[in-house]
Structures are given as structure tokens and as C-alpha cells.
């Protein structure tokens, strides 16, 4: 196949709505180049959703970077690839197979393309990346690294992108290492000029910023941020001064980001010393133990982990639940069980988190769907943990945690104050005439009054224990006292329904007997799937769950529909099971839409599953009273 002409297959023509996928070898420096491409699209004012699909080894295995450009602002995976940049021979068969008919493959034409890789229904664009690098560079490492920058430059030409934007980003990226600016600029220029000379108008995919094609982008004020960074900032603004952790993919960057920003935002202005502490513990058990100890002492503390760490922490979570000690646990979910796929995403810790530990335990869970919500919910988590005196578990995942995503700027109210809940201070204890009871339900809401150690020289001191006790924290094995305590804890969990974020409900454009429930990272593809199905005449109301325990609106939503599709990324339909277990609803009404191969679910997969489920269904639509709405995608 010629390296100077694209094949004449049918062409996909699209403006501001397509998917580019880079296929690379892990450890070759491709991530920085691919991010440069995504950042340039974003800088041009277009919604972009990049995601890094990487292996769990350090070097040598296939890695991918998928970039979705969507004028409508869809952030989830669409499914399919319109343009593939194939520079990894090891995965090329699979990579080419993913390309949509009429799509494009950019490949290294230094060697002739194997006939077995050629499809008559797609367009091939050969650029001799290796040959160019051999000609321009003598250092082997430079040849490896600059090949990536060369293909980014070529894409800038093929897609009619503003080349100045790429140059600006390179200059910004290497402003502290100016010697690297010139060679990177040269590599960009090499790729751009080659593609411009040999492939004018060869690709029907275009990016147009502003004007009639994207008029709503003129006031583009969003940011690119990953969920883990947003969580770290939420912890700082939420008042956290202590973190204990054990490194575990994909949660590690939460504490790394917390440390980086705390060094700027949590410094005593008078002494210049840190107003925070971080401990890398010997294991996950030690980490959660330190968090519970710090929280008991009045500090706002957290840990970050993933599924395997959550399993190890479960006994300590039971202690915090039963002894009623605040704590925040960040769970960045990955594919399990056991080691599973450490660098792939799932939502498969739901049940283990909700009921973590032995005995009758129930934990409050939060389900953020965006980077902005990661920030907001983390701040809320610290308030909730102290108001409810219980662990709060943030249920993020690798897709949200480790990938940059389009987000509105994070918002913070400088007048906001920490909500520490029911705390008795020294003055309160001094004025009390009755005996202080740590576990007395004074307000009949299940939430008792706590004290901080050292609040009073002679009043309010108790032994915090994981064994049974009475209302005054005195050890007892009396069955009646135990039952009273357990029933109060259940009452507190019911009270939590009035504290946690409510679900977001969006009504369809007309009456329908179908509903859809999603949460976390299934939300964006879920909303997109609903729009696709509506164009086909299939209407669905939606509910985005944001917290557990579920409030009455969840029961009402299911009751108002004949069928409700529950979209989640795990094998066993864990959210569906949790809904059935905790709510008064008929199991047959809830239909699972499941996806668990480790990649984020796509709108296409959701649409296909729902089409199949309702193919022969002709139930008459019922009237509903859907009040809340959510417009974000």
C-alpha cells in the first residue's frame, strides 16, 4: 500500500463529533503526546473526553488513549472508533477491527502494511514515522519519544486543527525546561508538514471552533480535571488535616494530589509549618486504624483505597460504625475480585461497601458522577461523617478517578463553615446537671452527643469500645441494652436519608412506562442512551442515584413505572440487589443492564440492551408526577 495516498473507501464525514483512538506501547512516552492532542482540542473550545486505557505493567504491553470530541458535550464512551492511530504492531489487528466502516487508520508506513490488516471499507493513511525519526535524530531515546509528537503534528494537519494551539501548549509544558521546547516544536512541525504535503483533505473529520458549527462554545468556561484530584481538593476544603493510606491503584493519586495541594493550602501563615499530616502506612488495616484514631481525637481524617483495600478495612469499618466514630473512606473502584484487573474500571464494590464488616452494619455511600461532584461530595462527606458519627464511603471508580474530564470550575463559598454535628464542649459539660450518656438518644433521631478527648477535666470521658455497652458507654452483655443500641443505630441510618444528597430525576418528554436508574460513571452514557432511544420513539424517565441510604423518592420512581432499567458496571447487578434489599419494590420491575469487561460502558451498549429488553413490550404508558429534573449530561 502506498505511503503517499489514502485508499478510496467510503469516508466518514463529521464535524465536532467523532472518536480518535491512539494505540501505543506502554512506557514509550506516548501518554504525554496523546494528552497534548486532547488538551489542544479542549483549548480550541470544544467538549472533549479523553480516557487512558493502560496495562498494569510498567513497560512493553499495549496501551490506548481514546479521545471523544462531542459538540453536544457527551462525556461517556460512545463505542466504536472513527480514526485510529496505530503505532503498536502487537495490537494492530484488534485496533483496526474497532474502526467504523468509512473510518481512518493512521499507521507507520516505514514498513509495508500487512495485507491481513487491510480492510476495503476503511481509509489508510501511511506516514513513515520511524523513517522520519531515523533521519532526524541520532539518539535512540529521542527517536522513541519524538515519534509520538510527530504523529500528533500529523493529526493537527489531517483534522484541520489550529497548529498555534499545539505550539502554545508545548511552550507552556516545557517552560521550566526550555531546552526541550525547540526539539518538540520541530517534531510537531515534521508531522504537520508531511501530512499537509501528502494528505490534503484526506480525512472527513473536522474540528471547528465557534461559528455556526459550535455557536455555544464561544463562552466556553470549563476545566479539564480528573476525579482523584477533585477529591483531594475536596478533602482540603472539607477540613481534612490527616490522611493515612497504603498505595493501591487506582486510588494512589488521591493522596498524592492531597499532599501536593496541602503544601500550598494547608500551611500555617505564622510559622510556615504544615497544618496537615500524611502517613503511608504498612498496610490498609493500619491506615484505616490511624484514620479512626485521628477522627476520634477530633481531627478530620480520611484514607483512599480500592476494592482489595476495602476488603481488608472491613473489620475496622465495623468498629467505626458500632463505636460511632467519624471517618471518610475514598473507594476508587477497579475490576475484581482478588487482584482482578487493577487498571480497569468497574462498579463492583457496592455491596461490600454498603455492608462492610461482620454483623448487622450499614454504611452511608456517596456516588459522584463528575469531577465537580467529586469535589462537592468529598466536602459533604466530612460534614456527614461528623453529623452522623459514622464512616462515609465515597464510591468513585477508575474511569472517573484517573481520567481527565470536562467539568465546570469548582465552586467554593468562603462563608461555608464545617458542620461538626452534635458535640458537647467543656462549657456544655460543666453546665450539665444530668449524667452524660455517650449513647443516649436525647433527640429521638438515633444520633447521640459526643465529646472530644480533653474537653473537660472530669466530665465527658468515656471508653470507646467495639464491645457491647449501655447508653453510658459502660461495658455490658445485657441483651436488652444491646438490642436498644442496635435499634438506635438503625434509626440513625433512617435519619441519614434526610442528610444525604437526593437522587436527580429527569422526566421524559412524554408519558412512559419505562424508567432508567444509573449512578456514578454510568450517568453520562445513560443520558446519551436516553436521547438516542427518544429519537426512536422509546421514552424513559431517569433517576440518578447519588447516595445510599435511598429515600422515599426511589421507591416512588420504581412504583410509577412498569419496567425500570438499572445500569451498572458489574456482573451481579449489585445496585439492583441493594435496591431490592433496602426498598419496598417488586424485583421483576428492575431489569439489569450490565457491563463488566473493565472498559467504561458505552451509550451504544445501553441502547442495545434496552432495545432487546422491550422489543415486544406494548404496555400502555402511565401518568406520573415527575418533578425534579437534571439537564447535565
Regions found by a protein language model. Name each.
Residues 17, 133, 174, 197-220, ...:
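Gly-rich Lys/Arg/Thr-decorated short loops/hinges at beta-loop-alpha junctions or inter-strand turns
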Residues 99-105, 120-122, 276, 299, ...:
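A short helix->loop->beta-strand "cap" motif at the edges of active sites that frequently abuts
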Residues 4-6, 51, 165-167, 178-186, ...:
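Flexible, glycine/charged-enriched surface loops at secondary-structure junctions
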Residues 14-99, 242-245, 249-355, 364-385, ...:
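Thiamine diphosphate
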Residues 55-58, 112-115, 132, 252, ...:
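Short gly/pro/ser/thr-enriched loop/turn and capping motifs at secondary-structure boundaries
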Residues 217-218, 224-238, 377, 382-633:
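Flexible, low-complexity linker and terminal segments
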Residues 86, 106-108, 128, 305, ...:
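Short beta-strand segments
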Residues 2-238, 242-244:
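Active-site cofactor/cluster-binding pocket
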Amino acid at each position: 500500500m502506498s505511503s503517499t495516498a489514502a485508499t478510496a473507501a467510503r469516508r466518514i464525514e463529521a464535524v465536532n463529533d467523532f472518536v480518535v483512538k491512539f494505540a501505543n506501547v506502554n512506557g514509550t512516552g506516548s501518554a504525554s503526546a496523546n494528552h497534548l492532542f486532547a488538551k489542544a482540542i479542549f483549548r480550541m473550545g470544544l467538549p472533549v473526553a479523553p480516557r487512558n486505557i493502560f496495562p498494569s505493567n510498567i513497560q512493553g504491553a499495549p496501551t490506548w488513549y481514546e479521545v471523544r470530541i462531542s459538540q453536544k458535550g457527551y462525556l461517556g464512551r460512545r463505542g466504536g472508533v472513527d480514526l485510529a492511530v496505530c503505532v503498536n504492531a502487537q495490537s494492530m489487528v484488534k485496533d483496526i477491527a474497532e474502526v467504523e466502516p468509512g473510518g481512518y487508520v493512521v499507521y507507520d508506513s516505514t514498513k509495508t502494511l500487512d495485507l491481513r490488516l487491510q480492510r476495503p471499507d476503511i481509509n489508510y493513511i501511511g506516514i513513515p514515522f520511524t523513517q522520519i525519526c531515523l533521519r532526524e535524530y541520532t539518539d535512540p531515546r529521542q527517536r522513541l519519544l519524538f515519534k509520538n509528537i510527530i504523529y500528533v503534528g500529523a493529526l493537527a494537519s489531517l483534522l484541520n486543527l489550529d497548529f498555534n494551539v499545539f505550539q502554545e501548549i508545548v511552550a507552556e509544558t516545557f517552560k521550566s525546561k526550555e531546552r526541550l521546547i525547540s526539539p518538540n516544536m520541530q517534531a510537531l512541525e515534521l508531522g504537520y508538514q508531511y501530512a499537509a504535503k501528502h494528505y490534503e483533505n484526506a480525512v472527513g473529520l473536522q474540528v471547528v471552533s465557534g461559528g455556526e458549527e459550535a455557536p455555544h462554545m464561544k463562552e466556553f468556561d470549563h476545566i479539564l480535571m480528573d476525579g482523584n484530584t477533585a477529591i483531594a481538593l475536596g478533602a482540603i476544603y472539607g477540613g481534612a488535616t490527616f490522611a493515612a493510606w497504603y498505595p493501591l491503584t487506582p486510588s494512589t493519586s488521591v493522596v498524592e494530589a492531597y499532599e501536593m495541594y496541602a503544601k500550598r493550602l494547608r500551611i500555617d501563615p505564622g510559622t510556615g509549618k504544615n497544618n496537615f499530616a500524611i502517613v503511608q502506612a504498612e498496610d490498609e488495616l493500619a491506615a484505616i486504624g490511624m484514620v479512626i484514631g485521628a477522627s476520634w481525637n477530633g481531627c478530620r481524617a480520611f484514607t483512599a483505597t480500592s476494592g482489595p483495600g476495602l476488603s481488608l478495612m472491613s473489620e475496622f469499618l465495623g468498629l467505626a460504625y458500632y463505636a460511632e466514630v467519624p471517618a471518610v473512606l475514598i473507594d476508587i473502584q477497579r475490576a475484581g475480585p482478588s487482584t482482578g484487573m487493577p487498571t480497569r474500571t468497574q462498579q463492583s464494590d457496592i455491596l461490600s461497601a454498603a455492608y462492610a464488616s461482620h454483623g448487622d452494619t450499614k454504611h452511608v455511600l456517596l456516588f459522584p458522577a463528575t469531577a465537580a461532584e467529586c469535589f462537592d461530595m468529598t466536602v459533604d462527606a466530612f460534614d456527614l461523617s461528623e453529623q452522623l458519627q459514622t464512616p462515609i464511603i465515597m464510591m468513585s471508580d477508575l474511569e472517573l478517578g484517573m481520567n481527565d474530564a470536562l467539568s465546570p470550575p469548582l465552586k467554593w463559598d468562603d462563608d461555608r463553615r464545617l458542620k461538626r454535628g452534635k458535640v458537647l464542649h467543656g462549657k456544655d459539660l460543666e453546665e450539665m446537671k444530668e449524667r452524660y450518656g455517650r449513647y443516649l438518644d436525647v433527640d429521638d433521631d438515633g444520633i447521640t452527643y459526643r465529646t472530644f478527648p480533653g474537653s473537660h477535666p472530669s466530665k465527658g470521658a468515656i471508653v470507646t469500645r467495639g464491645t457491647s455497652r449501655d447508653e453510658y458507654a459502660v461495658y455490658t452483655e445485657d441483651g436488652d441494652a444491646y438490642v436498644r443500641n442496635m435499634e438506635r443505630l438503625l434509626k440513625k441510618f433512617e435519619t441519614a436519608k434526610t442528610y444525604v444528597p437526593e437522587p436527580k430525576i429527569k422526566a421524559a418528554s412524554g408519558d412512559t412506562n419505562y424508567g432508567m436508574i444509573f449512578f456514578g460513571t454510568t450517568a453520562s452514557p445513560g443520558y446519551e442512551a436516553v436521547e438516542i432511544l427518544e429519537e426512536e420513539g422509546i421514552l424513559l424517565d431517569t433517576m440518578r442515584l447519588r447516595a445510599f441510604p435511598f429515600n422515599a423518592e426511589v421507591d416512588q420512581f420504581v412504583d410509577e413505572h412498569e419496567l425500570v432499567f438499572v445500569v451498572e458496571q458489574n456482573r451481579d447487578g449489585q445496585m439492583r440487589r441493594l435496591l431490592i434489599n433496602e426498598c419496598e419494590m417488586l424485583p421483576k420491575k428492575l431489569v439489569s443492564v450490565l457491563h463488566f469487561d473493565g472498559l467504561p460502558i458505552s451509550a451504544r451498549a445501553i441502547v442495545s440492551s434496552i432495545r432487546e429488553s422491550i422489543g415486544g413490550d406494548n404496555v400502555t404508558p402511565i401518568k406520573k408526577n415527575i418533578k425534579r429534573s437534571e439537564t447535565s449530561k
